[in-house]
């Protein structure tokens, strides 16, 4: 059954989770020497800079969506693999921090609207973070795994990376994550 308060709380939670996640990537890349995201106006918590309109529409239809990827040039890092690892995991860490902040707000504020919005935001942050840990391209878990593998696997990784997109789409549309 349609519930407007749930929809609005979800929209706020999704905007918050996407913004925190993408800002985490942009800020960590900046700290590691890559200002690509900063020059593209993406080092911000403003959801309008991160939300992909089509990804948001698909999210409400299929319960799966996407944000605009933060542009990162790992060639600007002192160590390509370490930098890529840190930037990949930073979005997930951002979602974890977001969930903790929401939990603290829930603990200290006992108003219905705050409980509704920040309760949704907490669970959405946890869900985004957990989902992004899957080791499937283009998710962050894949960035972590590929950064930990020796350089000799790079050709294999890049050759078969597109297979990961297909696996991700098939698994989502078959309902394996439901």
Each model region followed by its residue ranges:
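Hydrophobic transmembrane alpha-helices and their immediate loop junctions
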Residues: 1-178
């Amino acid at each position: 059954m349609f519930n407007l308060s749930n929809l609005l709380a979800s929209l706020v939670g999704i905007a918050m989770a996407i913004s925190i996640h993408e800002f985490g990537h942009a800020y960590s890349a900046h700290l590691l020497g890559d200002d690509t995201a900063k020059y593209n106006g993406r080092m911000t918590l403003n959801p309008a800079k991160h939300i992909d309109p089509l990804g948001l529409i698909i999210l409400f239809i299929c319960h799966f969506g996407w944000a605009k990827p933060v542009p990162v040039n790992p060639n600007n890092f002192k160590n390509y693999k370490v930098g890529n690892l840190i930037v990949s995991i930073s979005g997930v860490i951002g979602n974890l921090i977001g969930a903790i902040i929401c939990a603290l707000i829930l603990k200290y504020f006992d108003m219905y609207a705050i409980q509704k919005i920040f309760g949704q935001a907490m669970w959405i942050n946890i869900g985004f973070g957990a989902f992004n840990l899957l080791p499937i391209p283009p998710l962050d878990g894949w960035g972590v795994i590929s950064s930990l593998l020796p350089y000799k696997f790079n050709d294999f990784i890049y050759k078969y990376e597109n297979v990961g997109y297909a696996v991700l789409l098939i698994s989502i549309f078959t309902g394996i994550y439901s």
